């Protein structure tokens, strides 16, 4: 007998309803629904995926803490342009603790109102010069100038790639693969992902598909983030 799916359509309905009723009074009245539709399925997915990522590298953090493995539903509106109180998406992410809480690469999967995404991402964090992008990825790309092009050839047909720089203090998105070594002197983030319809997450084989994705993109994390 096939295993029960981790997620149901109720997860996506909850995010859509939250988007229409993004107020504390609504969220407080629907906490039980949030737990059943979002929190519990994501914790089950962590249990399913932890052995997979630990097989790739046993230094991955799989402790199940909010912030470390799970994104926060509450939005920090102090500095955000979007002043809505709650995010209409949730992420499960795996990364390896770095010295001084240095920003590092992640394997991740996210569900939102109408989309599922999964893959690899790395950001510079608040201090780029102290991030894995600056200390690990940039010098490696300068030493192996064809590495990104090889990853594009390996993954480009199945995965989307985009990256960010800052221009005049604003984040600027660049579609495609950062194949030029000079790109890595200013890159602030890089994402390589698969984008799927909600139905992908409601299938019993979803964890198996995630395992395949994580194995395929793990070399990106290893190259850009692990000293």
What are these regions (language model features)?
Residues 25-44, 48, 212, 216:
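A non-catalytic, amphipathic alpha-helix used as a structural packing/dimerization or gating element
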């Amino acid at each position: 007998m096939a295993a029960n799916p981790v997620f149901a359509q109720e997860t996506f309905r909850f995010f859509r309803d939250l988007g229409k009723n993004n107020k504390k009074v609504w969220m407080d009245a629907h906490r039980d629904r949030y737990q059943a539709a979002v929190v519990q399925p994501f914790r089950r997915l962590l249990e399913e995926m932890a052995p997979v990522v630990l097989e790739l590298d046993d230094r991955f953090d799989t402790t199940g803490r909010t912030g470390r493995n799970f994104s926060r539903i509450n939005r920090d509106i102090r500095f955000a342009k979007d002043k809505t109180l709650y995010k209409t998406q949730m992420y499960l992410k795996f990364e390896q603790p770095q010295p001084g809480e240095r920003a590092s690469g992640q394997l991740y999967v996210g569900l939102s109102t109408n989309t599922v995404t999964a893959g690899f991402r790395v950001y510079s964090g608040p201090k780029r010069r102290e991030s894995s992008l600056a200390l690990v990825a940039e010098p490696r790309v300068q030493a192996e100038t064809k590495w990104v092009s090889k990853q594009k050839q390996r993954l480009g047909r199945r995965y989307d790639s985009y990256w960010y720089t800052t221009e005049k203090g604003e984040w600027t998105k660049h579609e495609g693969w950062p194949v030029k070594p000079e790109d890595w002197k200013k890159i602030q983030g890089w994402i390589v992902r698969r984008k799927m319809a909600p139905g992908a997450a409601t299938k019993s084989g979803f964890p198996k598909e995630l395992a395949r994705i994580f194995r395929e993109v793990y070399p990106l994390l290893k190259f850009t983030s692990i000293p």
